[in-house]
From Swiss-Prot:
Catalyzes the inactivation of reactive sulfate esters in carcinogenic arylmethanols. Highest activity towards ethacrynic acid and cumene hydroperoxide. The keyword Glycoprotein does not apply. This is Glutathione S-transferase theta-2. Keywords: Cytoplasm, Nucleus, Transferase. CDD domains: GST_C_Theta (cd03183), GST_N_Theta (cd03050). One of its GO terms (biological process) is glutathione metabolic process. The keyword Translocase does not apply. Its EC number is 2.5.1.18. Glutathione binds at H40, L41, K53, V54, E66, S67, D104, N105, I106, R107. Belongs to the GST superfamily. Theta family. GO terms for cellular component: cytoplasm; cytosol; nucleus. Residues 88-230 form the GST C-terminal domain. Homodimer.
Length: 244
């Protein structure tokens, strides 16, 4: 069996892995794990990842979780262009500098709107307005720091070329945009960065990867999204309760 990627394109880190593999012509079998249908909770998927999360890479008997580990594995195994994950020590360290900051400040912050606007209501849970407001402020602060500390006068997050950092970042920042919160508005520096990254990746690939999340709000309004099965509700409610 060749390379298998277990993904759901509603998931930010899954999209980063998908886009990376596609952009670099890496052959893989897509194993879609539909989170809304609770497929990640199935016994079958638990055998692949006992953490019950996507993305997951399976390369023969080798199983790897965590999107950044997966991206680094793919970069090295398929010898993709150096700019993604530079061999130069300091350039590579800057990619990790961002990814560390990203895990603390971006991941977990920009996905909240999906819970407040779509997933909570889908299972009948309303997120308190004060949490929504707090999240809005956290996003503004994180964007400011992203611009001031990382982008500065550079074309991309970790320098003058596209790296894994840009891909991870873009996929998180797209999530609120899909839900009607265009956080790029009034931020020319960030908008120019987004345009550069998307131009590099190609409009067609971006559209393909972003389609499911871009249509989620419309589907929620039309009530065509599958309601997650009851066994998924407890973990979803826990996730919502953890929103700071
Ligand atoms: N740090 C992990 C995050 C993985 C993760 O949280 N995946 C989410 C989708 S974005 C998931 O599978 N959630 C299912 C659940 O927690 O029940 C990574 O970057 O791969």
């Amino acid at each position: 069996m060749g390379l298998e990627l277990y993904l759901d394109l509603l998931s930010q880190p899954s999209r980063a892995v998908y886009i990376f593999a596609k952009k670099n012509g890496i052959p893989f079998q897509l194993r879609t794990v539909d989170l809304l249908k609770g497929q990640h909770l199935s016994e079958q998927f638990s055998q692949v990842n006992c953490l019950k999360k996507v993305p997951v890479l399976k390369d023969g008997s080798f199983v790897l979780t965590e999107s950044t580990a997966i991206l680094i594995y793919l970069s090295s195994k398929y010898q993709v262009a150096d700019h993604w994950y530079p061999a130069d020590l300091q350039a590579r360290a800057q990619v990790h500098e961002y990814l560390g900051w990203h895990a603390d400040n971006i991941r977990g912050t920009f996905g909240v709107l999906l819970w407040t606007k779509v997933l909570g209501p889908l299972i009948g849970v309303q997120v308190p307005e004060e949490k929504v407001e707090r999240n809005r402020n956290s996003m503004v602060l994180a964007l400011q720091r992203l611009e001031d500390k990382f982008l500065r006068d550079r074309a991309f997050i970790a320098g003058q070329q596209v790296t894994l950092a840009d891909l991870m970042s873009l996929e998180e920042l797209i999530q609120p945009v899909a839900l009607g919160c265009n956080l790029f508005e009034g931020r020319p520096q960030l908008t120019a960065w987004r345009e550069r990254v998307e131009a590099f990746l190609g409009a067609e690939l971006c559209q393909e990867a972003h389609n499911p999340i871009m249509s989620v709000l419309g589907q929620a309004a039309k009530k065509t999204l599958p309601v997650p099965p009851p066994e998924a509700h407890a973990s979803m409610m826990l996730r919502i309760a953890r929103i700071p």
